[in-house]
A protein has these predicted regions:
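Scaffold/interface architecture of coatomer-like assemblies
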Residues: 1-189
Length: 189
């Protein structure tokens, strides 16, 4: 099913799998068979170092030009990461990489896990989804590819001459009804 997303994007991708640690399974490539092959036979086992794996993925993007996004498929639980969610978000903000989260089989009652996946997506300019069955992935991949293809890059130069390197919030409003604008929550100068 990831093949559907990669076919639609006609871009490059890498595959990083994780359990108790992240592992680069397929380096950045535009060869769909390599990515599809890397996905074959994956199964959940051992712990889930979710935050460490996201940070690892963000570092992998260092030096990669163009639009960059992470598609995170997970049950949302983190077990044993050295990083916490706030540190992970800090890395994501600095990297400027959108995170799209797909929560797999997460009960509505597990609100904390849902909240974390939603936060990772929304604060990085991505989007979150929750599904019960993998048959729903095709529709999600369509939505993600449409969104990635419909992005615009806006540049802004602050008049704030302060040399402070603190996080600065961004507020973007669209002056036309019926349009939805999504952006990163902020940036570091």
């Amino acid at each position: 099913k990831v093949k559907l997303l990669l076919d639609a994007l006609r871009e490059r991708g890498a595959l990083i799998v994780f359990n108790d640690h992240p592992l680069l399974t397929v380096k950045l490539t535009n060869q769909l068979p390599a990515l599809a092959g890397g996905l074959a036979g994956l199964k959940a086992e051992r712990g889930t170092a979710l935050y460490d794996s996201v940070v690892f993925s963000l570092f992998y993007f260092n030096g990669v030009k163009g639009q960059r996004a992470i598609l995170l498929l997970s049950d949302g639980k983190d077990e044993g990461s050295r990083f916490d969610v706030e540190e992970t978000l800090d890395f994501a903000r600095r990297a400027g990489v959108a995170i799209y989260t797909v929560g797999l089989n997460i009960p509505r009652s597990d609100s904390e896990v849902r909240k974390v996946l939603k936060k990772l997506a929304e604060e990085t300019g991505g989007r979150n989804f929750f599904i019960k069955d993998s048959t729903e992935l095709a529709g999600i991949y369509d939505a993600i590819q449409l969104e990635l293809r419909s992005r615009y890059l806006l540049a802004y130069q602050s008049t704030n001459s302060s040399r402070e390197l603190r996080f600065r919030l961004v507020d973007l409003e669209v002056g036309r009804s019926g349009l939805d604008a999504k952006t990163i929550r902020g940036y570091y100068p």
